[in-house]
Amino acid sequence: MEVIRSFFNTIRTLFRAFRSRLATLINRIAYKITSLVTGKRKADELFHSYRQNKKAARNWWEDNVDVNSKYYRPIVTVWKTIVYGVVAFALYIFCVETNFLWLMGSMPSVEDLQNPKVAQSSEIYTADGIMIGKFYTENRTPVPYKQISPNLVKALIATEDARFYRHSGIDYKAMASVAWGIVTGATDRGGGSTITQQLAKKLFKTRKSGARGLLGYVPGLGTLIYKTKEWLTAIKLERNFTKEEILTMYFNTVDYGNNTYGINTAAKSYFSKAPDSLNVQESAVLVGLQKATTTYNPIRNMKRSLERRNVVIDQMRKYGYLTAKQADSISALPIELKTKFETPYDGNANYFKNAVVDFVKKWGDENGYDLYTDGLKIYTTIDSRMQEDAEEAMTQKMKQLQRVFEDHWRNQNPWRDEDGNEITDFLPTVVKRTSKYRALAAKFPNNPDSVSYYLNKKDTMTVYDWKNSGEMKKYWSSMDSLDYYKRILRAGMMAMNPQTGQIKAWVGGLDYNYFKYDAVKQGKRQPGSTFKPFVYTTAIDDSSFNMNPCDEIVDKPFEKTYEEDGEEKVWKPRNATGTYTYAPMTLRRALAQSINSVTAELTDQVGAANVVRYAKKMGITTPLKAVPSIGLGPFDVSLYDMVAAYGVFANNGTYTQPILVTKIEDSNGKVIEEFQPEHRQAISEESAFLMLQMLRAGVEEGGGTSGSIRWRFNVTLNGNQLGGKTGTTSNNSDGWFMCVTRDLVVGAWVGGDDRSIHFRTTNLGEGAKTALPIVGAFLEKVYKDKSIEPGPFPKPSFKISKTYNCPTQWAPAASDSLGIEGDSTPAKRNEEDEFLIGPPPIPLDTSKRN
């Protein structure tokens, strides 16, 4: 018996010790919660008062309560219920706050509370400070409190939280009202959530699955837990921020529908105004919209939006922000919207923006930044005026060229094989490369008839309208659409400052909304004769050859037997005219007049491998083979690389890597990184100068293939000097023009979406007729706008040791078309090129068609 009594005494002692420690723990929890709500100083005062009152209450209890009274047990029961309830509540709050045993889900940390983060739009700016694009998951640009209209603040407080300035995050009176409404069945008691609680929910996503614990999935209990989190977070927000800061965060966080987040974007999207310019009725519309962005959307449901706006106005009257007369007057007004919703590819420079996005995403992956959520400010290199000029030039000249192309083919199909015969299965073959075909083939794997049916099924669609540079509605099938788009010529243009590498204009196509493929960097096509300068640079710069522009090579047929991939081949290029002078010709003249035979002979002398080496040194990054025809540009290159490589000539032989972005700032305006281009000496300064003179000869001297830019466009102001090189590939599949000035290197490419789509005659399809007009029109606009000042190339600061002043004798300007794999069959002569002085207007630019 004594053993049993001892055992029970031990258990009682342990229980008392546990109860004592539990009481201490509960006291600590209660103290922390009280500190959280009231602050440490106030909590100390309360707990000191509590201890004194507790002692006094105990003394009073012992002196006045009769333990034998019939009321003693009920009083004790009530008292214990209160005490245990408080203890249970304290334990519950502790578990929620600490996510005890992962039951309750996470709470925002102190760092989260002090530096709340919302997804912000990243903005792209031009070199002259104009914003040209925003990229985001949520289109949001925060504004400070001073840029928020007082009308918005009044409307929000009157509608959502009338006692906002009198509570500390939780409106107990409103909560009691809601509770009473639940008991009585009343439905007009409001929601009870304060503005601060709503902000807590929006900022920290307290109801998302990631914030739930194990108990969060229990019906009813889950609601209680996330509500508790919002209460606790609201209290913390009130302790960390002023009322103005809370309102500012709220307005910058709210979703206003139509992928519009924050009051700044909402004001601009719905009313084309800054948020500090919103009047009462506009403010009421936006505050009312917060309740349900679909139901009360003024675009989708004007009637419901108007009703909701008037509810907000009535609340403003109720709480004294408006007089009854003002409220009645405003309520009678209609909602007048002036919508302008932003998309990432609004405006111009869309191909450039896409290139910037690719660059920043890669940079962000390496540096821990997200383009779509971190509110970056990205400062780019393009000049807004030059970009506009470039797009206008592209639109104007391609519209004219497309008219010529349509007239040229009339009712015939333009897809032709190398012999000029129509490719009869062209569209059925091409359609198999489309996503539409792949989707249908997957849906009907063994049913080609069904695939064909849906490909030829007509429906209303919106397509690109090249005649008006816009869009048009057509009742077409997918095959009709493919047929239409394949007939449209494509183009790209890029302009770069050769000294800084800064890209000043980038036009990757006709319209980004319809032609996503970027002809500047993504597109790679044969450069034709624009590749020839690499041959001449090799001959002049490489000390093994040490040639000069006045050295001569006989213009005669060239033939080369060589081996490629184990197979013996014979290459016999022909001149574009199909004729030869059989006389010595200077390198200067040969390049200016784009003589294929001389280039082929020079390539043979310097070696194809050396030409490849120099092309790589100067910036060509695509694969090149050391074959005899390398000098005539048989391998695909990008316009981007070609512009960079030609920049070497204008930058004293130094290759400067093209750059798109100069610096990136964070959302607070702090510079994260500044970008500088790579520089390397590719060729000597003297070689660069000599090549520049040779390129000038192509523009300035008789017979030069680029000469038309001087008399067709006003680009020689102020003694302006240009160097240029045209290029045209076999069958006129590609037209190129590369132009060098003292401040800009500009390149353009024109061709069909497929190489089999082209002009039949060099007279219409050569680079001088397709690509050169785009560059000429661009430079004319740039000089007219005074984006840059025209002028001569700077004189060399060093002695020129080689002879270069051997002007080309007068000769008819030849085409630059290549017959890379052809024989010496004469080509059709371009009659228009016979006129070098005062030539007649070229139909390409002067024809007027409706």
PLM segments and residue spans:
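Peptidoglycan glycan-strand catalytic modules in the bacterial/periplasmic cell-wall system
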Residues: E2, S6-N9, R16, N27, ...
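N-terminal type II signal-anchor transmembrane helix
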Residues: E2-Y125, R163, V183, L401
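Residue-level preference for non-acidic, small/hydrophobic
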Residues: G129, L156, L199, I246, ...
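Short, well-structured active-site flanking segments
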Residues: Y165-M175, Y261-N264, T323-D328, D541-D565, ...
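Conserved catalytic neighborhood of penicillin-recognizing serine enzymes
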Residues: T184-A211, D276, K340-Y351, N546-V611, ...
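Non-catalytic structural connector segments
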Residues: D188, T323-T381, R385-N446, T579
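Active-site loop and adjoining helix of the penicillin-binding protein/serine DD-peptidase-beta-lactamase fold
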Residues: E230, A234, E238, Q290-R308, ...
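A penicillin-recognizing enzyme superfamily signal
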Residues: T380, S384-Q400, V431-N497, Q502, ...
